[in-house]
Amino acid sequence: MGRQFICSIYLPYTINFHLDELEGNHESHPAITHQEKVTQTHRDSVKIDDILTRLSISKSESGQATPVLTPQLEGMNDYFSLGPSKRTGGSMTPGLGAMSPIPGSGRSSPLYTQPRSRATSPSRVRQADRFAAPGIGAGALPIRRKRRDSLAKSVALFESARWSVERGVVGNSGLFHAVDAAVRDHGLQNPLWVGLLGMPTESLSEKTKNAISGALLVKHQSLVVYTSDSNFEGHYNHYCRKILWPSLHYQHNEIFSFFHEESNWDDYVAVNRAFADALIKNYKTGDTIWVNDYHLLLVPNMVRERIPSAIIGLFIHVSFPSSEVFRCFARRKELLQGMLGSNLIGFQTEEYKRHFLQSCSRVLYAESTFDRILLDDRYIDVYAHPIGADPVLVDKWLENPETLEVKEVLEKRYANLNIFVGCDKMDPIRGIREKLLAFEQFLYDNPEYQKNTILIQTSTFTEEQKEYGVAISDIVTRINSAFGDFSLDHLPVTILSSDLSYPQYLALLSVADAFIVTSLREGMSLTCHEFILTQRQKKSPLIVSEFIGCASMFSNGAFIVNPWSTLELSLSMKKALTLSTNERNQRYSNCLDVVLTHSASNWVTGFETKLKKSWTSQQKRDFSRLPRFTLNFIGNRYDHAKKRLLILNFDGNAVTWEGRHEFVDFHYGYMVSILSKLIADDRNIVYIASCLEEDELESLFMHVPGVGLIAENGCYVLPHYAENVHQSWIRLYKKQQMDWREPLHDIIQYYSERTPGSSLIDHGFAMEFNYVKAENRENGLRSAGELASSINETQHGCRAVPLDGRVLCEPTTISKATAANYIMTHLIKNPEELDLILVAGNNRTDESVFAWANKSKVSSFTVSMGVGNTEAKAYTDGIPSFFNVLNSLCA
């Protein structure tokens, strides 16, 4: 059984160096960076340590590992911050840095002794090189010499130190938990993690790196990826955090884009290349590769270029914006092309999936369907499959002694109070400001709740969001000043500014009377799932922003609100506190069903199953793997068949709207003679399928009397003579199936007028936007992408197909397959006697009839005469080769 390579920017594990054991080294571990800064909010709110002291909540002394909280998809670690003063507190051993706690992770972060980053700011260096006058930078040589000396000392220091593997404190904890759950439930047999260590590694010697890699591979099934500190600084802290993250969440920052997007693109590519190289080196036939999230969007195509047959899946955990936002990325094409190296791409919601398909259509001009991107040589499946929490893990920790103890104390401390709870990192995207403003409005509008209702919000403050933290502080101060009673020690808003342990976090969720998540945009928010699992007894309601991925999942149970509407959110708070028992139970039951159904384990096994199914299906359509259509391939079964149906199409190579005479000059006589031989055999029923109109097609095949014809890609059928049906054209569509034509004509005309040199061509059954002769090719491509996206999003009954130099708009309810099915059910006498079907074609319009024949109960042969991804089960090298086989069959 093959291995499952699970790629995430960080491994679930990291390394702790025990430098305090070295002789002469008496330094203690460095202080935590984020604890140096204290904002005004701390003075207006009660710190978690103060609360725990006041409530006599003891911390667990057990040695049991505490899992990482799932609310935080990734840690915004600052261990690569440049200023030494920001890295350390007090004296430090040279070359050391502190692993910063995860801002907003919601748990205590163990402090590991690890190397300090050797990175210089890539963006600053490159911007200086870009705009500086000659000679600038010469004075840096002494600094570089000192840096080399310091690096040498650090390498020697860490090489002599003992180290241990520890559970990491940064990374996609939701993914980590999900994989652990799938392994526990036997849904995943042989996972192998691929990622970074979550710490700077330039100060480590090759010997140390190899030892660490070996230990993690053997004991922890983890493949370590190494990259330079500078590359990671540019990749993660600049390109990912300041370019991709904000824009993916509809917070595009033009200033950051100007300074970081192009300057840090090479770093993003370099880190992705390091992952791809590790995968390529270790991949074996039968293995699967599962790439996770926006940090590694280029990896799928990098691997595909080296291993064309690899099984590659990609899952995007964050939200995916509309095409209007995504096209703002300077490297939008490269990002999408990197993603399209996958066999399967997964998203949290149908909305994100639709946005991705639209982006591919508008940016890459790729043909797309509801759940698929069609490329020339293959296709990519796209689907929505939301991640979930692990009920088994949560239930286990709910029974933990510390959880029960904290819960008991909280219940006593806040008895007779209504408790709203929120858990978010301090980030404008999380909507803490909107939540506080709505709570303030709630207290103003409902005086009866002013003295008996509180909001407890956990939020870790970071230097990165200092200004936002000050704004939050102002609102908290205003609310507590207006509605607080300091004589009674009553504060309506409590900001817990330090991380909670996992038991404390679960205890807080379990005592909540309502849980409020008001993110302005978020991929999923697993805090909602965990809240539901903690409420089996109390059954408190959930208030969720409509802009979170889980909103659609909990639509039948939670209060779905617009966080921008202060009034709507305020009213939802009151409704949550005044629910009847029956409604409360029903809402909770609906939410619990969702959480249990969409569990973490089911998510992992579902993705793995879908990935393998997609790869298998795509392999069957791989043109290079198809058998050649020869006399030996079909001859025996053809000879023994008593009744045969042949549907042949030569449009793609032989007949086009502009090149029909080429077909006539080179193949016409040969084709007519072979078709005449086929029709002369009473066992054969022969149809020619084409995109041509009735008169053109009938004129072209006038020298083959009795042949059946399918015109305009299935809109009309002229029966084969042997069916004893009057040979007149039969229309296979109803007039209402063409209602899309009139409005579509105006849309295409609009794009044609704004694209000089382009034209609208009406083919009867279809319409075409042709920009082959457009004065500006780029303008034509842009118009084509917008047109295809607009039609596929808004028009019913038709779909736009981007082709080379044109966009073909065709009906969705009419095809060669519908015509073939009509022939089978209405025109062929005694269809049950049919024992062989042969379908051959050479362009994309034949794929539907290939699929139809493949699903038929009758023995079928489907043959592609073109090159590319196809539903056909065999191929030939063009029309002449196919004619030669037919000629041999007639002999």
UniProtKB/Swiss-Prot annotation:
Its EC number is 2.4.1.15. Keywords: Glycosyltransferase, Phosphoprotein, Transferase. It catalyses: D-glucose 6-phosphate + UDP-alpha-D-glucose = alpha,alpha-trehalose 6-phosphate + UDP + H(+). One of its GO terms (biological process) is trehalose biosynthetic process. It is an enzyme of class 2 (transferase). Residues 132-613 are annotated as: Glycosyltransferase. GO terms for molecular function: alpha,alpha-trehalose-phosphate synthase (UDP-forming) activity. Residues 88-126 are annotated as: Disordered. It holds the Pfam family Glyco_transf_20. This is Putative alpha,alpha-trehalose-phosphate synthase [UDP-forming] 100 kDa subunit. It comes from Schizosaccharomyces pombe (strain 972 / ATCC 24843) (Fission yeast).
